[in-house]
Amino acid sequence: MALQIPSLLLLAAVVVLTVLSSPGTEGGNSERHFVHQFQPFCYFTNGTQRIRLVIRYIYNREEYVRFDSDVGEYRAVTELGRPDAEYWNKQYLERTRAELDTVCRHNYEKTETPTSLRRLEQPSVVISLSRTEALNHHNTLVCSVTDFYPAKIKVRWFRNGQEETVGVSSTQLIRNGDWTFQVLVMLEMTPRRGEVYTCHVEHPSLKSPITVEWRAQSESARSKMLSGIGGCVLGVIFLGLGLFIRHRSQKGPRGPPPAGLLQ
């Protein structure tokens, strides 16, 4: 079901063209009225984030051209509208397509503020290294900030507690299908042993900023850490196996049933 919201989003213009007949027309001077209507509609499908823009052009109660964002271009409804549709597709098509966001989505978020758009979605933050290399080699840290709403967000990089401003770059905000956003903020750096890099994220959904750390360490240190984790996992497995065997051995073999039960 499509929800039509003309009160705030419908910008309809009705132009009444009054054409006076020539003085020589029988019956004297009389007025002839021609009505040209321009009707844009924004549709929002209930329970989804789908938006549709439809613009109708009507002359004397007859629609002759239509733009539908689902189609993506102006289409002539009658032969009268064919020249206009061809011209508008050449001159104004990109601007009209953009109005799905600049008009419909923008006004819906700013004026209607429906329950689905009042929500605050907290971002997820993950740090990754673009290339696996040893210390003291140029590299790039990537802070992936995903699934947040609204779009306003501030992401900063810190090295050992000091904000980094050189070598920082960012993608544009990427809109997800559910209206949440994601962004990648990169930091070009040369990691040295003991350095701590922090991705600092501020967002309206957060009571306090999210901070995620990445520590520079050598391959040998990383290998030792992984070996330690693997040793702990194996230790837990063998401990559980030993307890299981001990529990089974304490039960002992079952003896024969009492003699009275065999009679």
From Swiss-Prot:
Subcellular location field: Membrane
Stretches for region Beta-2: 121-214
Xref: SMART domains: IGc1 (SM00407), MHC_II_beta (SM00921)
Entry-linked InterPro entries: Ig-like_dom (IPR007110), Ig-like_dom_sf (IPR036179), Ig-like_fold (IPR013783), Ig/MHC_CS (IPR003006), Ig_C1-set (IPR003597), MHC/Immunoglobulin (IPR050160), MHC_I/II-like_Ag-recog (IPR011162), MHC_II_a/b_N (IPR014745)
GO molecular function, one term: peptide antigen binding
Protein name as it appears in the record: H-2 class II histocompatibility antigen, A-K beta chain
Organism: Mus musculus (Mouse)
Protein's GO biological process: adaptive immune response; antigen processing and presentation; antigen processing and presentation of exogenous peptide antigen via MHC class II; antigen processing and presentation of peptide antigen; immune response
Superkingdom as given in the UniProt entry: Eukaryota
Region (Connecting peptide): 215-224
CDD domains named in the record: IgC1_MHC_II_beta_HLA-DQ_I-A (cd21001)
Residues of this chain annotated as glycosylated in UniProt: N46
Entry similarity comment: Belongs to the MHC class II family.
Ranges of the Extracellular topological domain: 28-224
GO cellular component, one term: membrane
Signal peptide: 1-27
